[in-house]
From Swiss-Prot:
Biological source species: Arabidopsis thaliana
Signal peptide extent: 1-20
Post-translational note: Contains two additional disulfide bonds, but it is unclear if they are between the pairs Cys-409-Cys-416 and Cys-425-Cys-471 or between the pairs Cys-409-Cys-471 and Cys-416-Cys-425.
Name by which UniProt lists this protein: Probable glucan endo-1,3-beta-glucosidase A6
Reaction equation(s) it catalyzes: Hydrolysis of (1->3)-beta-D-glucosidic linkages in (1->3)-beta-D-glucans
Amino acid sequence: MSLLAFFLFTILVFSSSCCSATRFQGHRYMQRKTMLDLASKIGINYGRRGNNLPSPYQSINFIKSIKAGHVKLYDADPESLTLLSQTNLYVTITVPNHQITALSSNQTIADEWVRTNILPYYPQTQIRFVLVGNEILSYNSGNVSVNLVPAMRKIVNSLRLHGIHNIKVGTPLAMDSLRSSFPPSNGTFREEITGPVMLPLLKFLNGTNSYFFLNVHPYFRWSRNPMNTSLDFALFQGHSTYTDPQTGLVYRNLLDQMLDSVLFAMTKLGYPHMRLAISETGWPNFGDIDETGANILNAATYNRNLIKKMSASPPIGTPSRPGLPIPTFVFSLFNENQKSGSGTQRHWGILHPDGSPIYDVDFTGQTPLTGFNPLPKPTNNVPYKGQVWCVPVEGANETELEETLRMACAQSNTTCAALAPGRECYEPVSIYWHASYALNSYWAQFRNQSIQCFFNGLAHETTTNPGNDRCKFPSVTL
């Protein structure tokens, strides 16, 4: 009997082990399948900071027309989420930065957020990611940053309470979360955020099988020093390579360098297998005169090559993680004319507000790169050298110009001195002329303090001198 019992026990243990191994393999297979599915659907960022943008209904139809597979919202807009229930699009929603502290403080508040922003729409609306905040570590917001992971954890708790397990929670970070990123193997997170934020964040993401979301823009890395990095290398079309001296890994584009620097930074903190997702990447189609390389051809080239790379089957991954599926969101659907900052901030879109393309792009990645209509060659791929002025845009509203004129002249005794009666720029006496001088003078005087030639859309830069023999407009020399 004892021999028989031992025999039966052995069979039971063996079969149990086999079943456990089979279940584990099945779980791993389903995880991999989900990762491949998410990565195969190239997404689009749908921002709405513009006064000329179409309705959510029209915008979602435009998203379907470009064959995007996933849409990322910068909020949880009820109208958009309702409309998206009638599509096959995967959806990502965002918790605004200002709500993070409240969510972190109380599970009830997080439960209410989920009850309001997810439960009425899910699963008919195929929500796949909830992103808590946006680039929260790029701002000097210590209290908010330490509340980041607790807020994420409470949202996951609420999702689990409702039996929802396939919505992943993450947070998009920018490249400035790194202290060093070159060469890629030198990637290291900033010391002041490593202990308080990064380690808890990575532990949370790893424990929930979520992704490290990254807003990564090779344009800014390249444009800061365009003479040191080939434009073709930044646009995925160069034959040049870079070899990391520490690892021997060979890089053929700038994006892979930047992604691997983050992967190496996570490895140094003990997370070598963390999933990676690109929450924003793109290239501006226009910018200020000193924003070299911001043009339609470069934007089209970058995004077409990006989609080709990221939609490849099997996945290409990066030199340090070959074969890694990376869910990717192109930035962005429209130009957003109410964004502040330099000109490029308002010009990342692929569509005009009427839905017509700024340039053609195929989000399935199936169109060969030679299959698109030719685009005009740019003239700003090398830095501009010369004088620049700031003048009102054609058709600028006179009432708004007058208000901005008063603001500019109030900032300094010298800004508008030449506009005093009898002075060299007093005539002709008109709001447009006086505003032209005042805005330009103010911009030239304070440009080194990050004043932009924008003034809520009233002004733009020009290389044509707006002054005359009597009235000399101050200029900025690039």
